[in-house]
Amino acid sequence: MNVETKHTRTMGDIFVQHSQKLELLKTVLRNVAELDALEGLNMIDAVQRLGIDYNFQREIDEILHKQMSIVSARDDLHEVALRFRLLRQHGYFVPEDVFNNFKDSKGTFKQVLGEDIKGLMSLYEASQLGTEGEDILVEAEKFSGHLLKTSLSHLDHHRVRIVANTLRNPHHKSLAPFMARNFFVTSQATNSWLNLLKEVAKTDFNMVRSLHQNEIVQMSKWWKELGLAKELKFARDQPLKWYIWSMACLTDPKLSEERVELTKPISFVYLIDDIFDVYGTLDDLILFTEAVNRWEITAIDHLPDYMKICFKALYDMTNEFSSKVYLKHGWNPLQSLKISWASLCNAFLVEAKWFASGKLPKSEEYLKNGIVSSGVNVVLVHMFFLLGQNITRKSVELLNETPAIISSSAAILRLWDDLGSAKDENQDGNDGSYVRCYLEEHEGCSIEEAREKTINMISDEWKKLNRELLSPNPFPASFTLASLNLARMIPLMYSYDGNQCLPSLKEYMKLMLYETVSM
């Protein structure tokens, strides 16, 4: 037996054993939830925190559907909050007044809850699912957050790590695969199923890591053969970073082809951004925008050579993308894709004209345009057609109008980006900022106040995004999840340190692509 055959057989054995353990755990999950409702919720929570919930979707659906009819234990904050969070994450509306039982006669949360650290963490996690106007959840976040921060001074090291991570990375606003490593370390087995879950998660993680590495090879090959890095030397050459967006948004391993395909339009968002922000003259940018709006290959005749190269590559990529979607899903998305690219370039051009004039727009006007220039709409429109679910005239018409599930994610990206003054990769060029526009507009306002305003607006956009989780719409659950994951990825992409580096992003890439989880 040669080495290759032995390796193949070993991997095959691992896969078979992994599949058997998964089936066992599905049975365990059903049985646990049947015998003890709270324990079933705890197990679902662990499955999600380990990033392997895509293996248990049917079981989770069935259990949470039954949980809707269960009256929460009135005196157990952890159970009430956990059930609230899991159901809302799954699209079930649970009223915020379930937490009124934990208030005193004055209508404020009981101070005695400060002794229940586990319950407070669950309350803080639940409060992240709030929507506009839900004052009880706003109060719950402030109350639990304050007491948890206070507790850090007297808890042991292990619990400090858990509490601090909850405050810094609440589950609903974090990427589960990235946070799974922390859960491996901090979670302690108090039942028979957690160790088996961890074992399955480790195998799953290593298998998915190999899949991602193969996708990077495919993406890098496409990018190299495209040749734009040589032709457009002023532009960013970061195919790995572009792929990370796709990897974060589309977490189901079965979506391998979709991740590779999605990275292609993402790369063009960055390239075109650099043309507008770094290299192009205003006159040339106007011509390029007109060409994209016309969407005719003959429209490039009057463009400079580097723009001809970029437009031709964009044109070919988009047509090829449309053909693949049509062959696989029976719908030609070309018209929607053309609209998204034209809208992006129009928004880029608006910004170029602003900065060429030396005048800052009103903050509201800046943000309205910035939602489009973020590129999120382009990415999510392509993603919708790649997923291929619920493609109807109604859903496509709504998609073309930039619905809230897109615009809120885009606003979060734009505002997060604007919180930092650093430019990606120390690039020169035009650079606007909501903070700068707000300061210009509000005389006497300090930069700290402007930043606080921006942070509050990000929180408000998350509430709008949460509302989309709970509102009927024609989009499939896979698209909603991908949109949420995009919003969750944003802090990693835009949290610069003092050296204008992205330490969180580098850590994410290292964990997801290069580090093997020991078995």
Curated annotation (Swiss-Prot):
BP term (GO), one: diterpenoid biosynthetic process
Cofactor(s) for this UniProt protein: Mg(2+); Mn(2+)
Uppermost EC category: lyase
Keyword vocabulary terms for this entry: Cytoplasm, Lyase, Magnesium, Manganese, Metal-binding
Motif DDXXD motif location, chain numbering: 273-277
GO cellular component labels: cytosol
One Pfam family linked to the record: Terpene_synth
Protein name, UniProt field: (3S,6E)-nerolidol synthase 1
